[in-house]
Every structure is written in C-alpha cells, then in structure tokens.
Amino acid sequence: LSAGMAWSPTNDFNLTVDLYNINITDRILLGATFDGSSDPVIAKILADSGLTQIAGVQFPTNALDTKTNGLDVAANYRLHPGAGLLDFTLAFNFTKNEVTRIDPLPAILVGKGSSYTSALDIVTINAIEKNRPDRRSSLTSNYSQGRFHVMGRISDYGKFVDGSLDGLETFGAKQLFDGEIGYRWDAI
C-alpha cells in the first residue's frame, strides 16, 4: 500500500511526498546460525549427520513476516542569481521495519534441550529492525554558472544498532558535511 503526491506551483519549486506500508509474508533470508561449538544439541545433530568438520550451519528460511512503514519527502527550490543557478534540495526519509511473526524452533530441535528458541537469532532480527538508521535527511545547495559549480551538503542519519551473537551496540545519530567544487572542461 502506498500513496504519494507531487506539487509544482512554479517552474522553480517542487515538492513530493510518498507514504508506504509494505507487508511481506514468509520473507526469505538467512536464518539463525546454529552453532555446534556453543550448543551440544547442534553438535550432536551435525555429528549424527556425518558433518564432523562443520561447527555450525545457516540456511535460507522463510520463517518470518515483516512490516515496513515509511515516509519520503523531497523539496527543490531554484533561484536565478545573475548568470547562475542556485538549487536547494531538502530530502527526508523515515522508515520503520518490524518483524511481525517468527516461526518456532525447527522440529528437530524441539524438546532436545537446545539453547535456541526460534528459527531466527538476535543478529537476524536486529538486521531487519534496527541495523540501519530509521531516519535520514539532507540539505543540499548547488550553485552553477557556466562550466563552474559548487555544492555543499549536510546529511543527518539517525541512530542504529549493530550486533553479533556476543551482543548489540547502539550508535547515536551522526551528521556529515561534504562539499564539491567542479569545472567542466568539455563544451556546455
């Protein structure tokens, strides 16, 4: 489900807004890493299968459903100072990803005393829900005249969480500043 609008009241200004809601049933991705070095039940299953040189297994699974909600907004405004062009672009994105269903533990592990509780581990769930900033925004200005141009941009990225089976680490919001000066050598 999505909805959007575009508005251009003049040749020098435009605004777009997009909303979206995406539900995926039986999403396919890599499931939990079933590690035999830390779980004796997994080690026994691997050994019983003749896989004595393998410490763990991971495989694609469709063991979850996900929901993504988001908003994209972009605005562009152009000025005409003298012989040049001055563009301002403001962009904003908010995206929230959520795991809405996880399959239970594979049948081969049920009731065997394994430390695993579902087909997914915290790393996989985190990668979907929190491993990328939930918001991003930028303000860019670009001046050009003839073959010459100058660009400046400030970007803001919201917090995100990275992790492994050893734990999760939260990184706070960050801002980046960048710029560019250019000259076109070929004909305009």
Placement of each model-derived feature along the sequence:
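Extracytoplasmic loops and strand-loop junctions of Gram-negative outer membrane beta-barrel proteins
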Residues: 1, 44, 52-61, 101, ...
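Transmembrane beta-barrel architecture of outer-membrane proteins
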Residues: 1, 11, 19-25, 35-37, ...
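Short, solvent-exposed micro-motifs at the edges of structured domains
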Residues: 75, 107-108, 115-117, 121, ...
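Outer membrane beta-barrel strand-and-loop segments of large Gram-negative receptors
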Residues: 19-87, 101
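Outer-membrane beta-barrel translocator domains and adjoining extracellular loop/strand segments
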Residues: 27-34, 99-107, 161-168
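Membrane-spanning beta-strand positions in outer-membrane beta-barrel proteins
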Residues: 2, 8, 12-18, 85-87, ...
